[in-house]
A protein has these predicted regions:
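Active-site-proximal flexible loops/turns
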Residues: 14, 19, 66-70, 132
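Short, glycine/charged-enriched secondary-structure capping and boundary segments
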Residues: 19, 38, 71-75, 104-107, ...
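Residues that line or immediately flank small-molecule/substrate-binding pockets and catalytic motifs
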Residues: 12, 61, 94
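Divalent-metal coordination cores built from histidine and acidic residues
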Residues: 79-147
């Protein structure tokens, strides 16, 4: 599928791009910027006048409260809110119930996050039960997917 996003304010610090231009997308990948008249007939068009187009944002400190406090927020509602705000990746804190201090809890969270609209990362607690007495097995936590 071809898509042209018209007149978006493209802001990309990595490339130094900061301009209002068209964005050309094919099969969900950006393939170019500017005018491509040969595409105009075949491409779906999206008017982005007045909108900013930027790389996805990353929030390195979120509290989705899942597991344990899902009446406040859960992986689904938190990820949808993050996506609506332009975030494509979030890093969840470990102060849940149970506390994220075992590989099994990490694996459970990451498994449930697989089909969400954003990338969900999970940090590990430093000590078991947040008690500051015994360290978690950091290698096991990393092997389970903790960041």
């Amino acid at each position: 599928m071809k898509l042209v996003i018209k007149n978006g304010h493209v802001m990309d610090p990595a490339s130094g791009r900061d301009e209002v231009t068209d964005i050309w997308v094919e099969d969900k990948r950006i393939i170019g910027f500017g005018e491509h008249p040969e595409w105009e007939e075949d491409a779906e068009k999206l008017n982005a006048d007045g909108c900013i187009a930027a790389p996805g944002l990353v929030d390195v400190h979120v509290h989705f409260r899942d597991p344990g406090f899902t009446y406040k927020e859960d992986l689904e509602t938190g990820s949808r809110a993050a996506a609506a705000g332009g975030f494509t990746t979030v890093v969840c804190m470990a102060n849940t119930k149970p506390i994220v201090d075992t590989p099994e809890v990490i694996q459970d969270i990451l498994k449930r996050a697989e089909n969400l609209p954003i990338h969900v990362k999970q940090v590990s607690a430093v000590s078991k039960g947040f008690e500051g007495k015994e360290l978690v097995d950091f290698q096991a936590m990393v092997d389970a997917g903790a960041c």
